[in-house]
From Swiss-Prot:
Name listed for the protein in its UniProt record: Homoserine O-succinyltransferase
Enzyme Commission no: 2.3.1.46
Subcellular localization: Cytoplasm
Ranges of residues in domain AB hydrolase-1: 51-360
Alphabetically ordered keywords of this record: Acyltransferase, Amino-acid biosynthesis, Cytoplasm, Methionine biosynthesis, Transferase
Assembly and interaction partners: Homodimer.
GO biological process, any: homoserine metabolic process
Site (Important for acyl-CoA specificity): residue numbering on this chain: 325
Species the sequence originates in: Pseudomonas fluorescens (strain SBW25)
């Protein structure tokens, strides 16, 4: 519990809400007549608005990327190791914007929001979203903030996909793109993992076809299982072996199916329980579908190099050796396409045992490489 914030912290931050009354047309063919986006900012926008950086979050992320909401808050924002004075995304230099995406469950309009047409939660009636839909909504937020062009758009995992989409959809509005632990599209295996997670939610009796809020319940079991499956894919075999091995919770085996016997079982159950108490099931379905649908090359004859021909940004691609969810091979595929499109791109593969979640962890070589690239950005 901090009584004084570290000197490299952005300190206390206050979330802000932006309301948009102009309808937003969506890829699914529907539209949202109006919507809200909750966001936070760190640092100061300079006179020419040339120092703005957009942070795009991953599947379960949100707007609170850095700093603290109160002096009593135990943990800072989810990317606090990378955002702040003297950190890779240096708030002495950059004005940083972090939002909760449309369809989220942390303040932006999403399935748990009230539908103005009937006064009930949207639930399963909330439209299916794509990465491109998010980028369009983010562009409107940029307009509201007076930002014509981002100095950089940065994201890890699903956030990296949004950063890439920015360079395709709004090529003149982003100067640098940093895609970390990401991929140009999901593999069949990744789609399969997402489907298992969705089925865990959809088949939970408490899901009620997505109208669980009206029923006054939560599909806790389904969300818990979905998170447990997902969390396994975010870690590496080495990191799980080092952290848990075959360690037992007690001194002996119980020879039953109900006891939590292994430490790794206890860890996964804790992660699932904690997640199911704070995340919306319909939002989880939306986020995984947006992941599945992301395939920008599909609009360019499946030619990834052609996809980026119109991009004007400079690119930085980073991957982690033990990430098997978005493996280094997928990042190299992206780098090869960018090089074929004659784009300015640098690539770094970090040797790290933490798996996919490594992009969230303050690994010294990763932070140093991140800082080196950001220091090169001129305003």
């Amino acid at each position: 519990m901090p009584t004084a914030f570290p000197p490299d912290s952005v300190g206390l931050v206050v979330p802000q809400m932006a309301h948009f009354s102009e309808p937003l047309a969506l890829a699914c063919g529907r539209s949202l007549p109006a919507y809200d986006l909750i966001y936070e900012t760190y640092g100061q926008l300079n006179a020419t608005a040339s120092n703005a950086v957009l942070i795009c979050h991953a599947l379960s992320g949100h707007h609170h990327a850095a700093g603290f909401h109160s002096v009593d808050e135990r943990k800072p924002g989810w990317w606090d190791s990378c955002i702040g004075p003297g950190k890779p995304i240096d708030t002495n230099k950059f004005f940083v914007v972090s939002l909760n995406n449309l369809g989220g469950c942390n303040g932006s309009t999403g399935p748990s929001s009230l539908n103005p047409e009937n006064g009930k939660p949207f639930g399963a009636d909330f439209p299916v979203l794509t990465v491109e839909d998010w980028v369009h909504s983010q562009a409107r937020l940029a307009d509201l903030l007076g930002i014509d062009q981002w100095a950089a758009v940065i994201g890890g995992s699903l956030g990296g996909m949004q950063a890439l989409q920015w360079t395709i959809t709004y090529p003149d509005r982003v100067r640098h793109c940093l895609a970390i632990a990401s991929a140009p599209k999901l593999s069949a295996q990744n789609i399969a993992f997402n489907e298992v997670a969705r089925q865990a939610i959809l088949t939970d009796p408490e899901f009620h076809g997505g109208s669980f809020q009206e029923a006054g319940v939560i599909p806790k079991r389904g969300l818990m299982l979905a998170r447990m499956v997902g969390h396994i894919t975010y870690l590496s075999d080495d990191s799980m072996g080092e952290k848990f091995g075959r360690g037992l919770k007690s001194e002996k085996l119980n020879y039953d199916f109900h006891s939590v016997e292994f430490q790794v079982e206890s860890y996964l159950r804790y992660q699932g329980e904690e997640f199911s108490g704070r995340f919306d099931a319909n939002t989880y379905l939306l986020m995984t579908k947006a992941l599945d649908y992301f395939d920008p090359a599909a609009n360019f004859d499946d030619d990834l190099a052609k996809t980026f021909e119109g991009a004007t940004a400079k690119f930085c691609v980073m991957s982690f050796t033990t990430d098997w969810r978005f493996s280094p091979a997928r990042s190299r595929e992206l780098v090869d396409a960018l090089m074929a499109a004659r784009k300015d791109v640098c690539y770094l593969e970090i040797d790290a045992p933490q798996g996919h979640d490594a992009f969230l962890i303050p690994i010294p070589r990763y932070l140093q490489a991140f800082s080196n690239y950001m220091n090169r950005i001129t305003l």
